[in-house]
């Protein structure tokens, strides 16, 4: 049997795509004159929407009180758990007794920027010893690393 592709059997997404209705091309096209906007009024004009406008009702952002602030020099910490390091070792991406620092974590794709500070937390279990160079570590994480013979050095 002939398995050749016939031109009349080819269907593309382009042939199935319905073209949008053109607006404002005269009253004969069905969407002419007002182009589906109705007559007059604020929504009939160009540049229509006013963000946060609720029809004269006091808007939600003026009803709610102002709260808090954003500190200018906020420290951005990338959180690394000891369980994450264990999983990396099990996946053979790192070897035991190695140094875990910013450059290593950046190359592995664990942190987005080399400028981020690293915070070591104690989620999960660690079974091999590692040397950590981090900016912050919780007390529980320090104990967990020390219990398997590793060490944590705080950089800043």
Swiss-Prot record:
Region listing for Disordered, in residue ranges: 25-48
GO cellular component, one term: cytosolic large ribosomal subunit
Pfam families: Ribosomal_L27A
Top-rank taxon, per record: Bacteria
GO molecular function, one term: rRNA binding
Amino acid composition bias (Basic residues), ranges on this chain: 34-43
GO BP of this protein: translation
Function: Binds to the 23S rRNA.
Assembly mode: Part of the 50S ribosomal subunit.
NCBIfam families in the cross-refs: rplO_bact
Family to which the UniProt record says this protein belongs: Belongs to the universal ribosomal protein uL15 family.
Protein name, per record: Large ribosomal subunit protein uL15
Organism: Wolbachia sp. subsp. Drosophila simulans (strain wRi)
